[in-house]
Amino acid sequence: MTIRRPGGACLFGLLLAVSPTPFPRRTTLTPIRTLLTPFGEFFKGQASSGLVLILAAVLAFAWANSPWRESYFTLRELPLTLSLGSWTLSHGLYWWVNDLLMALFFLLVGLEIKRELRVGELRHPRQASLALFAALGGMLLPAGLYTLVNAGGPGAAGWGVPMATDIAFALGVLALLGDRVSPGLKVLLAALAILDDLGAVLVIALFYTSGLNLLALGLMGAVWALGLGLNAAGVRHLGPYAVLGAALWLTTLASGLHPTVAGVLLALTIPLGRRAEQEDAEPSPLHRLEHGLHPWSAFLILPLFALFNAGVSVAGGSLDRVTLGVVLGLIIGKPLGVVAFAWLAVQLRAASLPEDVTWPGMLGLGLLAGIGFTMALFIGGLAFPEGALLNAAKLGILTASVLAALAAITVLTRAFPRQPR
C-alpha cells in the first residue's frame, strides 16, 4: 500500500508556521514574571506530555507483545510517498516519524536551549555551572559504564544510548509528587535535561553520522547562513523561516547528517527579540514559535514516536550485554554521575546548591535524569539496525526508565516530606 501526498517537506514548514493556540501579541510582565512564566508553562506542558508519553509507550509495548503483534510491525513499515513533480521520497511510517516529525521536536529542543542560554537559568555562568557539571557527569559515567560492559562486543556502538534525559517523562513523574518538590529542584532538572539534550545533539551529529555529501553539506550551510542573515536583518515574521526550515531539512537529509539536526540549526536562526528583563515586551518570534510547537510536540509528535519505537517483543528474549549496559548506565551511572559532579562543582566553589535543594534531593534528581526514554530510543535507532541489538537496547531503556522513575519517587518522597497543613 502506498499513500501519495504532494509537497515534499512542506509539512516541516507548515507545522512550524501554524500555532493551534494563539499567543498574546503583547503582554505587560514584571521582570520576575517574565522569567518565571515561561518556565511555569514549560513545566506544565512537559509534565502533561510525559503522562501522554507513558500511555503511548505502554500501548506500544502491550501491542507488540499481544496476539496482534504482526499488525503493529506492519503499521510501522506502511509506506508513505511524498512527491513533487519527478521528485519522490518514499519510506515507511516509522522513518517519517523518526526523521521528519522528530526534526520538529529537535526544533523545539533547540528553541528551549537558545532561550535558556539567553534569558533563562543558564544565562549566568555561575548559575549554569551546577547544571553543567551535573549534566557532564550524567553523560560521561553512563557512557563509561555501558562501554565497560560492552567493550569489544557487537553492541559497543550503543555507548550514546544511556547519555540523555527525557525531560517530558521526568517532569511527568515529578508532577506526580505535586507541590512537595522544591521549585529549585524543578528548575535545576529542566536546566540539566536541556544541557543533556544539547549533548545528545552533539553526539548524534559527531558520532552517529557517516558518508557525508560535501556538496549537500555546503548547500545546507548556505541555507543556514541565509537564516542567520534574516535574523540579523530583523525579520520577525515566521513565514520565511518556515520555508528555510523545509530547505534545511532536505539539504541536511541529502548531506548524510541525520535530518533532525536541521531542527536545531533552524532554532538558532529564530530571533529572540528584546531582553526578557524589559517590561511591556512583545513576545519574540522564538517565544511565539515555542508556544505554538509545544502542543504539537506534546500530544502528537512524542506520542507517535513512543508508539512507533517502544514496541519491543520480549518473546524468547534473554538478558543481553546491551540491555545490561543500558540499565546500569541509566539507573547507576546517571544518578552517580549527576551527584558526584555536582559535589565536585560545589567543592571547587564553581557552584552552590540552591537554598531549597539538599543532597538527597540531588540524588532524586539524578534518578529522574536516568529516565532516558525518548532520546535513548532515538540514539538506539541510530546506533543499531533493526534486529536483536536494537530490541535489547529498547528493552534496557524501558526497564531502566521504569526502575529509575520508581526509585526517584521513593527518594524524593523522603527528601521532601509533605508538610502538615
Curated annotation (Swiss-Prot):
Q: Which family does it belong to?
A: Belongs to the NhaA Na(+)/H(+) (TC 2.A.33) antiporter family.
Q: What organism is this sequence from?
A: Deinococcus geothermalis (strain DSM 11300 / CIP 105573 / AG-3a)
* GO cellular component entries: plasma membrane
> Keywords of this protein's UniProt record, alphabetized?
Antiport, Cell membrane, Ion transport, Membrane, Sodium, Sodium transport, Transmembrane, Transmembrane helix, Transport
* Compartments (UniProt record): Cell membrane
What is the protein's membrane topology class? Multi-pass membrane protein
* Reactions catalysed, as given in the entry: Na(+)(in) + 2 H(+)(out) = Na(+)(out) + 2 H(+)(in)
* Intrachain disulfide bonds: none
Q: Which GO terms describe its molecular function?
A: sodium:proton antiporter activity
Locate the transmembrane regions by residue number.
Answer: 48-68, 93-113, 129-149, 157-177, 187-207, 215-235, 253-273, 299-319, 326-346, 364-384, 392-412
* One example of a Gene Ontology biological process annotation: regulation of pH
Please give the name of this protein: Na(+)/H(+) antiporter NhaA 1
Q: What job does the chain carry out?
A: Na(+)/H(+) antiporter that extrudes sodium in exchange for external protons.
NCBIfam families from the UniProt entry: NhaA, PRK09560.1, PRK09561.1
Q: What gene, per UniProt, encodes this protein?
A: nhaA1
Q: Does the keyword Transmembrane apply?
A: yes
Would you say which domain of life the source belongs to? Bacteria
Report the InterPro entries cross-referenced here. Na/H_antiporter_dom_sf, NhaA
Q: Indicate the principal place this protein occupies in or around the cell.
A: membrane
